[in-house]
Structure formats: structure tokens, C-alpha cells
């Protein structure tokens, strides 16, 4: 191998950071390159039935016989052009195709003749490195972003004790709970004594009570005009309202 194009050495294991193993699949690079097979069809493979080999050869012979007319007079006459077909070859092709997909007793579908009629292998799920709890269960509400904070704080939902969860079915909301609290507004900064102090100064060097006295005229409440809304009625349709 050319180390420039293939830096991986033969027989080196595959990169498997999650240590997932699949039955029947190799876990490392092959030790040697596979032998060159000049044939297009792997006839020596057990999954390639002999019927398929005969079917391929018979079909190729049929195409070669249909390629050119056998007599030269058919080209000059006008009308329907009939290709000469070997009846025996067509019959053999049909027999080969029916033998390749023959019906095996006891199975509801057709199987190749090389496949055994035994019980299927037991179900083995693929190893999943992720836990099931990472994927939320579907609900009637759209999935919200787990890290997005809306205009309201949600009431924390706590799980019950393990023995209660074990013997009961606990259904918790996948989205915002019914009890919501408005987000608290940060209080305005107070005019404390420490506000006027600079790093490296003392209390005697600060302005003291001068910064604590109000320096401006208090502004009254701003009048807000509330529009008149229509009376609450029964809607003609029902839908799930968004949470925010």
C-alpha cells in the first residue's frame, strides 16, 4: 500500500470511540486485499444460485438471437417485423426463473433455493450509546427549547419517590406547567454610600450623604389609555394555544 494514499496499516482496528460492536461486521481493516475476480458475477458465492447462472447465460443467448433477423427478405417487405425467437430458449428461461424463486412450504413469501427454511435469528437491537431519556415523549404541545427562558418562570416539576414511580404511572407535562409565575423585574439600583466610592478610598473620603439625597424631581405616574376589548365569547373553533 502507498502510505501517502492509505496511511492506515492492514489489520488496524476501526475507530470506535463509543465501543459499539455489531454482530457479523468486521471491527478492523482487512489484513490483505481481496483476490481479484475477473468475473462480473461472483459465481462461487453461496448466495449466487446456479439457477441464476443458467438464467443469465440463457438470457444473453436470447438477446443475441433477437438482435439480427435470420432472413434478408424480411427487411424489404413492409408490415409487422417479427423477431425470430427460439421457443426452447424462452421455455428454458422461464423454467430457470421459476426455479430460482420457487415457493418453499411453510413460508408466506418466496425464498431463494439457497436460503434455509429454519427459524429467523433472534432479534438483537443495535447498541445505542444514547440513553432513552434524552429523547422526550411526544405530547399534544409543540416541543419547546429546553434552554430558552420565556416571559414567565415555570413551576418546577419534581419526580415522586422511586417506589411510587415503580407502582404508578406518573405523567408529567412535556412543556410548561399550568402554574406560571411572572419573571421578576430587577430592582433599580439604590443610591447607597458605596456607590460614590472609588477603589482605594475610605468612607471619610467619599461624598457621604450627598449622593444619597435625591438629585431630581420625582416623576409622576404616566397616564396609560387602555383600549376597549370585545366581550369574551365562546369561540367557534378550538385549538391548543401556544405557551409563549
Swiss-Prot record:
What this chain does, per the entry, is described as: In cancer context, protects cells from induced-DNA damage and apoptosis. Acts, at least in part, through PI3K/AKT/NFKB signaling pathway and by preventing POLB degradation. Decreases POLB ubiquitation and stabilizes its protein levels.
Family as reported in the entry's similarity comment: Belongs to the FAM168 family.
Organism in which the protein naturally occurs: Homo sapiens (Human)
The domain of life for this entry's organism is: Eukaryota
UniProt-listed InterPro entries: FAM168A/MANI
Q: Which disease annotation does the entry carry?
A: Associated with cisplatin (DDP)-resistance and radioresistance in the treatment of lung cancer as well as oral squamous cell carcinoma and poor clinical outcome in patients.
N-acetylmethionine sites (modified residues)? 1
Tell me the residues on which Asymmetric dimethylarginine occurs.
Answer: 102
Among the record's GO biological process terms, what is one? positive regulation of base-excision repair
Summary of subunit composition and partner proteins:
Interacts with POLB. Interacts with AKT1 and MT1X. May interact with FAM168B.
Q: Which UniProt keywords apply?
A: Acetylation, Methylation
Please identify the protein, giving its name as recorded.
Answer: Protein FAM168A
**PANTHER family per the UniProt record, alphabetical:** MYELIN-ASSOCIATED NEURITE-OUTGROWTH INHIBITOR-RELATED
